[in-house]
Amino acid sequence: MAGQEDPVQREIHQDWANREYIEIITSSIKKISDFLNSFDMSCRSRLATLNEKLTALERRIEYIEARVTKGETLT
């Protein structure tokens, strides 16, 4: 009986080692996913801010171009 328990014990230990490995991999994937989601939100926010600034600049340029075309002086 003692000889049969040894392989069983080995399988149990191997199973636990596999489960721990899977847990580590799963945890790492979750951390990467959380980071990527956070990075995505940060990039979207920054791009939205840049878009607003560019839109404001485009409007100012159009206004200045219109005044120059009409021959008005810029004051």
From Swiss-Prot:
Keyword Acetylation: yes
One Gene Ontology term, aspect cellular component: lamellipodium
Disulfide bond positions: none
Coiled-coil stretches: 41-72
Key words of the record: Acetylation, Coiled coil, Cytoplasm, Cytoskeleton
Membrane-crossing residue ranges in chain numbering: none
Subcellular location: Cytoplasm, Cytoskeleton
Highest rank taxon of the organism: Eukaryota
Gene3D superfamilies: 1.20.5.110
Any one GO MF annotation of this record: small GTPase binding
Modified residues annotated as N-acetylalanine in this record: 2
Gene Ontology process terms (BP): actin cytoskeleton organization; actin filament organization; cell motility; fibroblast proliferation; in utero embryonic development; positive regulation of Arp2/3 complex-mediated actin nucleation; positive regulation of fibroblast proliferation; positive regulation of lamellipodium assembly
Keyword Disulfide bond applies: no
Primary site of residence: cytoplasm
Subunit structure of this chain's protein: Homotrimer when in free form. Directly interacts with WASF2. Component of the WAVE1 complex composed of ABI2, CYFIP1 or CYFIP2, BRK1, NCKAP1 and WASF1/WAVE1. Within the complex, a heterodimer containing NCKAP1 and CYFIP1 interacts with a heterotrimer formed by WAVE1, ABI2 and BRK1.
Role description: Involved in regulation of actin and microtubule organization. Part of a WAVE complex that activates the Arp2/3 complex. As component of the WAVE1 complex, required for BDNF-NTRK2 endocytic trafficking and signaling from early endosomes.
Family designation: Belongs to the BRK1 family.
Protein name, UniProt field: Protein BRICK1
UniProt source species: Mus musculus
